[in-house]
Amino acid sequence: MADTLPPLSLYIHTPWCVRKCPYCDFNSHEPGTHGFTPRDLPEAAYLDALLQDLDNDLNLVAGREIHTIFIGGGTPSLLSPAFYEQLLKQIEARLPFADGIEITLEANPGTTEQERFIGYRKAGINRLSLGIQSFQPDQLHALGRIHSGDEAITAVTQARQAGFSNIY
């Protein structure tokens, strides 16, 4: 039955950023304004909320395969690899993943490190959007970005070393 139904794509929003970029119109909030830091986000509560939201709409997509998942934000790379491992496992338990599913995570070069990239890859994420608008310090400052050009280059290198080949 899944072969006759149109493919399904899923967007998952992460509403937190270390700092809100002045050009960003997306729903995102700085964690400090809510009493927690970027490294102690309420992951368990957010996971429960996302799964409850999915469960509420499962009847609308019954029998369909997910072909793509895009995790945007905000800054999804603020959440741990363990969070995404659980999230993806729970989604797949509810809806089948197509062979060759593409799972994208937006990541800010200022919030990543080698271990996180390795963990994201192990969790099932196979595509990264690194959000590198520039390598020039003056442009990065004007854009309100939290990373430097060197950090952007390091992030690409670390992502490749972690096994990511689909990076943009």
Predicted segments, located by residue:
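Intrinsic-disorder/low-complexity coil detector
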Residues: 5-6, 21, 41, 95
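Local cysteine-cluster metal-coordination motifs and their immediate loop/turn environment
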Residues: 13-28
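Conserved non-cysteine loop/helix-boundary elements of the Radical SAM core domain that shape
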Residues: 28-60, 65-168
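Structured core elements
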Residues: 11-13, 129
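N-terminal [4Fe-4S]-dependent radical SAM core
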Residues: 1-11, 62-64
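Divalent metal-dependent hydrolysis catalytic cores, especially in the metallo-beta-lactamase
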Residues: 9, 22, 103
